[in-house]
């Protein structure tokens, strides 16, 4: 398909920070950009949002869902926390199975929420949706071996069966230790945002490789420049306008208080016997700040994330407004 001036939307993983993406979607609606979206690529929570944006569309409904229902995702899987489950997990470790532990969260709750939000029939006029995942091919202690994983792209709108579409979305968001791996057609899949295993937490590649009909790519990242200062690697984006939308301030939840207990790395560097630990402390503090927002599945935090996504989305994307929208604003 030839380039028609459309928009490709990229949604990263980030757990509860998916609420930020919902706010950006609301901003895109108010700026008159949604009808230009031709394809959406998402990983993990970004895949769930991609499907909701394409099939549900209504930003108010989606934002309300994030503010009032998404916290249910954090429901623990009590069966997997039992002593018997822990015993079986230890046996699996000794047997060398790829995923010796079951997920700590109840996947059936997430499945129920998606069924509640999503229509049974996929809209024929919806943008293309690509959900990225990692196929786990097993092997001895495969969870520690990057060669045991292979990237997988699910084209959600091309799957006619609603239940299989659901499982493909869950497969993209099956974060290890959080949710059990998802089995589809005899293959097991885990969260596609697991960069350390070859995943792509900012799934730009599917848009660049498979969507020639877009001239503008909007990339919504979950982490602020304070945490993730590295610029986006966008090889192959020549000739396209690439716009990043990221939090202007770090998305923090209650867990953020723990980062304050990490000693200052610069202070540690001045102590010869502890200096080698300094870089590790920086990494630990950074990871705690990332997790702070990722696991902030409480209504207050997610409402803040929605508001921040809306504000940051308006600021970053205002220049993409159609000219007729600009004219109305100046009346």
PLM regions: where:
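Patatin-like phospholipase
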Residues: 1-41, 52-331
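Gly/Ala-rich beta-loop-alpha elbow adjacent to hydrolase catalytic centers
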Residues: 42, 46
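Long, contiguous secondary-structure blocks with strong helical propensity
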Residues: 47-51
């Amino acid at each position: 398909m030839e380039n028609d001036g459309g928009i490709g939307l990229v949604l990263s993983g980030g757990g509860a920070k998916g609420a930020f993406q919902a706010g950006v979607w609301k901003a895109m609606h108010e700026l008159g950009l949604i009808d230009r979206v031709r394809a959406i690529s998402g990983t993990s929570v970004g895949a769930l949002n991609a499907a909701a944006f394409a099939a549900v569309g209504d930003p108010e409904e989606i934002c309300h869902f994030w503010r009032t229902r998404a916290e249910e995702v954090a429901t623990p899987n009590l069966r997997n926390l039992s002593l018997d489950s822990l015993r079986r997990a230890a046996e699996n470790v000794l047997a060398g199975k790829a995923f010796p532990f079951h997920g700590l969260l109840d996947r059936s709750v997430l499945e129920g929420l998606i069924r509640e939000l999503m229509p049974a029939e996929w809209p024929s006029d919806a943008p293309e949706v690509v959900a990225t995942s990692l196929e786990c091919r097993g092997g001895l202690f495969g969870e520690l071996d990057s060669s045991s994983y292979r990237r997988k792209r699910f084209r959600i709108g091309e799957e006619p069966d609603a239940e299989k579409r659901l499982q493909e979305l869950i497969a993209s968001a099956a974060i290890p230790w959080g949710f059990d791996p998802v089995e589809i057609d005899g293959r097991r899949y885990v969260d596609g945002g697991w960069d350390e295993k070859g995943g792509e937490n900012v799934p730009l590649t599917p848009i660049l490789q498979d969507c020639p009909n877009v001239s503008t790519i909007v990339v919504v990242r979950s982490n602020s420049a304070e945490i993730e200062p590295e610029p986006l690697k966008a090889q192959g984006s020549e000739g396209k306008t690439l716009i990043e939308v990221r939090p202007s301030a770090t998305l923090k939840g209650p867990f953020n208080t723990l980062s304050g207990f990490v000693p200052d790395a610069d202070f540690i560097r001045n102590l010869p016997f502890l200096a080698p630990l300094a870089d590790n402390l920086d990494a630990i503090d950074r990871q705690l700040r990332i997790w702070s927002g990722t696991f902030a599945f409480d209504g207050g935090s997610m409402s803040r994330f929605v508001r921040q996504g809306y504000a940051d989305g308006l600021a970053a994307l205002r220049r993409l407004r159609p000219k007729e929208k600009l004219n109305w604003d100046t009346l």
